[in-house]
């Protein structure tokens, strides 16, 4: 159950009339309360069902906000400045959980001539931890991890801290027939616990965009736009992991990670075996991405009907993820890679062609996904068993290259005179399937969930009253 109470007031209007236009402002205040609750029954909480045990969630937070926006027309209808407009906004937010934050935005629009628009923005942002991050119920998990004190595969085996906590012949237990780890990244034989963290703070971001829009006078109905953007998110909220906690304790000597009383923490018995492990989300690391958006729209009316075309493409030039604050640990470069958290396509592109005449319309669409590379564990399945690139830092990686995929869609529609619309269509007309990817299990199959699964036919009726 979720509950939101929101009280707000705002005022918009013109503060003054300037030579280039009206000086517009907007101000407002808001008070909001968020509450969430989830109460699994006793059987689910005990782990007696077919699922793992899940604890109850209950909690909320409140905040007060005030904001102001202004739009200032600097120039208009003069040579090389048909329009020059500056916009600015700022918002102050005060949360009863982590405190307060102020975030601002600046924007500039410039039209040197009627057919060309140049636009740019700079903005700050934040994402506050939600109820599940702060107060989510603890749930069981059978995690995969590497104990650094394991005498066969542990990177800290034999150091003083390990010898203090485990026997000299310590082996990490495993959830298999042998009961002993036979490699790094072994699954725990007993359930660990993943919980929430009431001490989380917001993620913060900074973004910059710069773009142009061209509407040539020699081609009425044609609009082209190109935008460059970059976004960096700091203090990201990420799941803490058992391996990270243990490495911090035994490899990096961070004492607080060895004896934590809150947050992520673990307990060993007299034989050195971990009998309890709790992990929580933490604020750490960053995400940085950069890319381009390209958009083409064309519409022309003729005696044979109205023809339209729309082509929207995104090219990602950088996607970087860092889930720790260790200077000697480089960030992960994920652009063009398929990993367990998702498929990071370098290029996504959608093309739509349409025709309309009277009450009838036809559209054809194409959806393009660029190829991907994924980690490969077996040489005989790797198309790139010895891959190296600047982003690998000199490492040789075993990768599998998966091809690009394009899906086609078609629709025929009729606008009925009784204010209704009838559509007959098919998504993935040619019944195309994306490539299997071993890093993207979906419903038990190695298939990225964003791809179509077979052809989809539909008949749709919409009635307006």
What would you call each of these model-derived segments?
Residues 1-85, 324-351:
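Outer-membrane beta-barrel transmembrane domain signature of Gram-negative proteins
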Residues 15, 29-37, 74, 90-96, ...:
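Transmembrane beta-strands of outer-membrane beta-barrel pores
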Residues 16-23, 75-84, 115, 155-161, ...:
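Short loop/turn motifs that connect adjacent beta-strands in outer-membrane beta-barrel proteins
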Residues 27, 223, 227-376:
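Gram-negative outer-membrane beta-barrel transporters
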Residues 54, 123, 136, 140-141, ...:
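C-terminal beta-signal and terminal closure region of outer-membrane beta-barrel proteins
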Residues 54-157, 161, 193-219, 229-231, ...:
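Structural signature of Gram-negative outer-membrane beta-barrels, strongest in the C-terminal barrel
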Residues 131-224, 277-292, 343-346, 452-455, ...:
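Outer-membrane beta-barrel signature, preferentially recognizing the C-terminal barrel domain
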Residues 234, 317-318, 366-384, 413-465:
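C-terminal beta-signal and adjacent terminal beta-strands/loops
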